[in-house]
Amino acid sequence: MGRREEMIAKIKELMLQPERIRNIGIAAHIDHGKTTLSDNLLAGAGMISEELAGKQLVLDFDEQEQARGITINAANVSMVHNYEGKDYLINLIDTPGHVDFGGDVTRAMRAIDGVIIVVDAVEGVMPQTETVVRQALREYVKPVLFINKVDRLIRELKLTPQQMMERFSKIIMDVNRLIQRYAPEEYKKKWMVRVEDGSVAFGSAYYNWALSVPFMQRTGVKFNEIIDLTLKGDNKTLRQRAPLHVVVLDMVVRHLPSPIEAQKYRIPHLWQGDINSKIGQAMLNCDPKGKMVMVITKIIIDKHAGEVATGRVWSGTVRSGQEVYLINSKRKGRIQQVGIYMGPERINMEAVPAGNIVAVTGLRDAMAGETVAEEQIEPFEALHYVSEPVVTVAIEAKNVKDLPRLIEALRQLAKEDPTLHVKIDEETGQHLLSGMGELHLEVKLYKLQKDWGIEVDVSEPIVVYRESITKPSPIVEGKSPNKHNRFYVVVEPMPDEIYQAIKEGIIPEGRVKDPKAVAKKLAELGMDYDIARGVVDIYNGNMFLDNTKGIQYLNEVMDLLIDGFHQAMDEGPLAKEPVMKVIVRLVDAQVHEDNVHRGPAQIYPAIRTAIHCAMMKAGPVLYEPYQKVIINIPYEYMGAVSREISQRRGQLIDMRQEGEVMTIIAEAPVAEMFGFAGAIRSATSGRALWSTEHAGFKRVPNELAQQIIRQIRQRKGLDPNPPTEKDVCPLF
């Protein structure tokens, strides 16, 4: 039996023993060394050759990732590790650290139970570290810590062992502070990472060594010995004395939970169904004999197999030929092939039981986040994405005959990545592609041209603004065109605390299933409980409440009213941009008794006009997306970089100096950040390292707002003059 066959046989055997499985991820700030760590873990476990590991980046198997040197898609591999005489199956998902790809991180967190947080010993805890830790803890994923690039502290910064220990302590404190802040109440203490119990390891992924207290106690290897070997440059002995994969995977097996353990506390939080039902119990207990339930976390388009859906099996067993329900998209499907990953390679299996990460083909309409089950059940709660699309490009096929293929390609791209929004502009016939940032869109467009061979013309990037209001409106009446239905609404600005709670998933978006529970949360955040009890729907950071009493037939049109509310929120009155932070309260209504007189053609315009007119009376304003920029540069470029930022309406938030290196943290409007990469490279002769992340929305200064509204309206083929209250409010 060859090495590969042996490996597959071992994986097949361990798949059936969930207590021996660990589903883990690696998450970190960009360039802190995640992918190098993943590769060296694979090499140690015998999945790739050691010489190549760290240089070859197995998990970065997309050509673009190799070229850019960053991880774009969360890849998935399975490997075997022996700990205290027993074999364990470790399923590892590598996630991107670049902010534009935050969606991949969110999806990967759903599939795993534990995560290795990687922090660069030189840079310490960075903003993106905080984002990934928050995402992990929100999905009830337990963390351990690996402090990477320790070789740089020894070689470049020439720190003494004492100084290094101080630096480690600070990183551990910072990570524990994040765990304290974001972990679920009952795990704030339990999940803190500690050097003494081995839930912290430190080392160098690139040079393939690591240490932890349990390892040092067991083997007698001392830190001073490692320092000497590093200074001598004896990397071979380093690897042999303190092998990275042994230290890190021991930490994983010892401190991160098996599916059996994790599902007991994760399922009640991720799934809203009845825990005491048969299927609820099967998931709690990770029972391979129960009914099958899996959640898809990623769709990959494979040249040979078509769409491959990767996901986590919570209960039952996935088999080829199985008839299943796609719960969210309300349709049936049939699973064709079933397999698991070994590196980028997919290996077919007859069946994959609960507790494993599976790859299936045949589910043609599945999206990331879809719940797939053998019978109709409550879906898992929606995945929370940390930031929303803020940049749009318009694309057209250069060749008209490519149009049908372009539409199909865009559909596929949007399926692979739900944080990408695709829309056809009805008026201009252009396809609008919105993403998290410039890089996100660049990567997707490259994929479009390379994988599909479609030549496209791409517009300059356009920023997606938001419309909102500054004060409560008076009561506004909206009439249906036939005058038989009337709706009376009030709009109010949404308090920041409530908006944050929605964005962080504490108050879930969508139709409200349990108004009392949501009202209780809203009341805790300062809303009047009696008003909050009317909450019906939460949509893109806006809220619709029914505060009427005993209106006849209102229930019959409630679905239409909610659709109309969505339409009003998708395109605000100022420039048809999405609306944010608005509370719409229905306070009174008259609804015609006859079904015929209260269809969509009557209800939509009535509620839409009422909401837009109320917004015009509530001090309408424009918000623009901001980015946080973190730049590391040699001290002498300080002035050039500050100038570059202030020219872009940016402001400096913080500056730190460590040795020769300055870290600048600034915020600037996304609209001013296009072309920043090139500008900063030339300003610093290519010596700047920088990353960005979404920093929310801020109000556009008044003097700029009118000009921007004109530009947007002109681009959309509307009358460029900003509308007045008279234009929006009908004369009744």
Curated annotation (Swiss-Prot):
InterPro entries assigned to the protein according to its UniProt record, in alphabetical order:
EFG_II, EFG_III/V, EFG_V-like, EFTu-like_2, G_TR_CS, P-loop_NTPase, Ribosomal_Su5_D2-typ_SF, Ribsml_uS5_D2-typ_fold_subgr
Q: Which UniProt keywords apply?
A: Cytoplasm, Elongation factor, GTP-binding, Nucleotide-binding, Protein biosynthesis
Give any Pfam family that matches: EFG_C
Q: One GO molecular function term?
A: GTPase activity
Recorded superkingdom = Archaea
Annotated PROSITE patterns: G_TR_1 (PS00301), G_TR_2 (PS51722)
The record's annotation in SMART domains points to: EFG_C (SM00838), EFG_IV (SM00889)
User: Key word GTP-binding present in the record?
Assistant: yes
Give the Diphthamide positions (modified residues): H597
Give the similarity note.
Belongs to the TRAFAC class translation factor GTPase superfamily. Classic translation factor GTPase family. EF-G/EF-2 subfamily.
- NCBIfam families assigned to the protein according to its UniProt record, in alphabetical order: aEF-2 (TIGR00490), small_GTP (TIGR00231)
Q: What is this protein called?
A: Elongation factor 2
This protein's gene is called: fusA
